[in-house]
C-alpha cells in the first residue's frame, strides 16, 4: 500500500534526486532547487545532470550538499512544476552516502550544470582515490589543495610541504616566451663570424648532434644581450644559474648566460652548458636536483676586465686544461663596437 505522506522524513546533509521523464532544462531545475523553501540549512552546492534513456526520454539527476543536516518532513518538498505548462515532477529521493560516487555517476555523460563549491567526502580508500582524481583534474593548484584539504585533511596537515611542492609542480605553467623589443634585422653591425655561427646553428638542415657554443665579450651597451635574446626561444640565465621550472625550460633552442662570473660557472655547470651536453642533472645549492634535457648551445655574454672576462679567466695557469677544453667546444667573439647603428638599443 502507498506510504503515508505523514511518515516521510529526510535527515541528510547530502541528497540524491532523480526526476524521471523530466524535460525541464537542467539550468532551470538548478535555479528551482536553489530557491526552494529551505529553512535553517541551505544548499552549499547543487549539480544537475541530464541523462537521455534508450527510449529517448530525459531524466534529471541532482546532487545537493547542504550547510547542515536537513529535517524535511514534506514528501513533496522537491516537487517541481514545469515553468511553461502544468506538468509536475516528483523525484526519487535518497540520502547520498557517498557523494563522490553519486557525483561521478550522474555526470558520466558530461551534460550538467552546477552552483557552489563541491565538498569532497573522505574516509574510505575508494573515496580518497576520488579525492586525488578530482585534485589532479582541478583547474588550479589552489583548487587542488582545497579538494585535498576537505577530502584528506590528515595528509594535508602532516605532509603539507611535500603536498604543496607536488601540486605546484603538477600545475606549473611553462615560462612565458620572451618578446624582443627590437627586430633582429635592426642589428646591422653583427660581425661576420658571429652571424655565421647563428646562421649555421639555426639552419635545421645543418644542425649538429652536439652544437658549438659561443662566448661574446664586449663593453656595456653594445646590444649583445638584445641580439642574443632575439634569435629564438631560449633560457635566460643572468647573474647566477636557476633551473627552476618557472624560469627554465627544456623545450627551447639555446641558453643565454649573461653576466655569470666565470669562476661561478666553473664551480657549477661549465662543461654541461658550454659543451651542450645531454641528459644531465643540476646540483645547485638550495634547490632539489633537476633533470636537464640539454643538447643545446649556450651564448655566454661577458664584459672585459678582471672577474668578468672569460678569456682572462681561462688565461690563468690553473685553468689551462679548462681553456683547452673550452676552445674545442666554443667560439670566442670580441666586439669592437655596437651590433646596431641606432642609439636606441643600448643593452
UniProtKB/Swiss-Prot annotation:
Short sequence motif RCR-1: positions: 16-19
Family: Belongs to the geminiviridae Rep protein family.
Record domain CRESS-DNA virus Rep endonuclease: where: 9-118
Chief subcellular location: host cell
Cofactor comment: Divalent metal cations, possibly Mg(2+) or Mn(2+).
Motif (RCR-2): 59-61
Region (Binding to RBR1): 141-151
Residue interval(s) of motif RCR-3: 105-108
Role summary: Essential for the replication of viral ssDNA. The closed circular ssDNA genome is first converted to a superhelical dsDNA. Rep binds a specific region at the genome origin of replication. It introduces an endonucleolytic nick within the conserved sequence 5'-TAATATTAC-3' in the intergenic region of the genome present in all geminiviruses, thereby initiating the rolling circle replication (RCR). Following cleavage, binds covalently to the 5'-phosphate of DNA as a tyrosyl ester. The cleavage gives rise to a free 3'-OH that serves as a primer for the cellular DNA polymerase.
Domain comment (free text): There are 3 rolling circle replication (RCR) motifs. RCR-2 is probably involved in metal coordination. RCR-3 is required for phosphodiester bond cleavage for initiation of RCR.
Protein name in UniProt: Replication-associated protein
Enzyme Commission (EC) number: 2.7.7.-, 3.1.21.-
Binding, ATP: 218-225
Localization: Host nucleus
GO terms, molecular function: ATP binding; DNA binding; endodeoxyribonuclease activity, producing 5'-phosphomonoesters; helicase activity; metal ion binding; nucleotidyltransferase activity; structural molecule activity
Source taxonomy: Viruses, Monodnaviria, Shotokuvirae, Cressdnaviricota, Repensiviricetes
Cofactor list: Mg(2+); Mn(2+)
Region (Oligomerization): 154-174
TM stretches of this protein: none
Subunit and interaction comment: Homooligomer. Interacts with the replication enhancer protein (REn). Interacts with host retinoblastoma-related protein 1 (RBR1), and may thereby induce the transcription of host replicative enzymes even if the cell is not dividing anymore. Interacts with host PCNA. Interacts with host SCE1 protein.
Active site: 105 (for dna cleavage activity)
Keywords, in A-Z order: ATP-binding, Covalent protein-DNA linkage, DNA replication, DNA-binding, Endonuclease, Helicase, Host nucleus, Host-virus interaction, Hydrolase, Metal-binding, Multifunctional enzyme, Nuclease, Nucleotide-binding, Nucleotidyltransferase, Transferase
Annotated GO CC locations: host cell nucleus
InterPro entries membership: CRESS_DNA_REP (IPR049912), Gemini_AL1_CLV (IPR001301), Gemini_AL1_REP (IPR001191), Gemini_AL1_REP_central (IPR022692)
Biological process annotations from GO: DNA replication
Residues reported to bind a divalent metal cation: 51, 59, 61, 109
Organism: Squash leaf curl virus
Superkingdom, taxonomy of origin: Viruses
Amino acid at each position: 500500500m502507498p506510504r503515508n505522506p505523514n511518515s516521510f522524513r529526510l535527515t541528510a546533509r547530502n541528497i540524491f534526486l532523480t526526476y524521471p521523464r523530466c524535460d525541464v532544462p537542467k539550468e532551470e531545475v538548478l535555479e528551482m532547487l536553489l530557491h526552494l523553501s529551505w529553512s535553517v540549512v541551505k544548499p552549499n552546492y547543487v549539480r544537475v545532470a541530464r541523462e537521455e534513456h534508450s527510449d529517448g526520454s530525459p531524466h534529471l539527476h541532482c546532487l545537493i550538499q547542504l550547510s547542515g543536516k536537513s529535517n524535511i518532513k514534506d514528501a513533496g518538498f522537491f516537487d517541481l512544476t514545469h515553468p511553461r505548462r502544468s506538468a509536475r515532477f516528483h523525484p526519487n529521493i535518497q540520502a547520498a552516502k557517498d557523494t563522490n560516487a553519486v557525483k561521478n555517476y550522474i555526470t558520466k555523460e558530461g551534460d550538467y550544470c552546477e552552483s557552489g563549491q563541491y565538498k569532497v567526502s573522505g574516509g574510505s580508500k575508494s573515496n580518497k582515490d576520488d579525492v586525488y582524481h578530482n585534485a589532479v583534474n582541478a583547474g588550479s593548484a589552489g583548487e587542488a589543495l582545497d579538494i585535498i584539504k576537505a577530502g584528506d585533511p590528515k595528509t594535508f596537515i602532516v605532509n603539507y610541504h611535500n603536498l604543496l611542492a607536488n601540486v605546484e609542480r603538477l600545475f606549473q605553467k611553462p615560462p612565458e616566451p620572451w618578446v624582443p623589443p627590437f627586430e633582429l634585422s635592426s642589428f646591422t653591425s653583427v660581425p661576420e663570424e658571429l652571424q655565421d655561427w647563428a646562421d649555421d646553428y639555426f639552419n635545421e638542415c645543418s644542425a649538429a648532434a652536439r652544437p658549438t657554443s659561443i662566448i661574446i665579450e664586449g663593453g656595456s651597451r653594445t646590444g649583445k644581450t638584445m641580439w642574443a635574446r632575439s634569435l629564438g626561444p631560449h633560457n635566460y640565465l643572468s647573474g647566477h644559474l636557476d633551473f627552476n621550472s618557472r624560469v627554465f625550460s627544456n623545450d627551447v633552442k639555446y641558453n643565454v648566460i649573461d653576466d655569470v662570473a666565470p669562476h661561478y660557472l666553473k664551480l657549477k655547470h661549465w662543461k654541461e652548458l658550454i659543451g651542450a651536453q645531454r641528459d644531465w642533472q643540476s646540483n645547485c645549492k638550495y634547490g632539489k636536483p633537476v633533470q636537464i634535457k640539454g643538447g643545446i648551445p649556450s651564448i655566454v655574454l661577458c664584459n672585459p676586465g678582471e672577474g668578468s672576462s672569460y678569456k682572462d679567466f681561462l688565461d690563468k695557469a690553473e685553468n689551462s686544461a679548462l681553456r683547452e677544453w673550452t676552445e674545442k667546444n666554443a667560439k670566442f667573439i670580441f666586439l669592437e663596437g655596437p651590433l646596431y647603428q641606432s642609439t636606441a638599443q643600448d643593452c
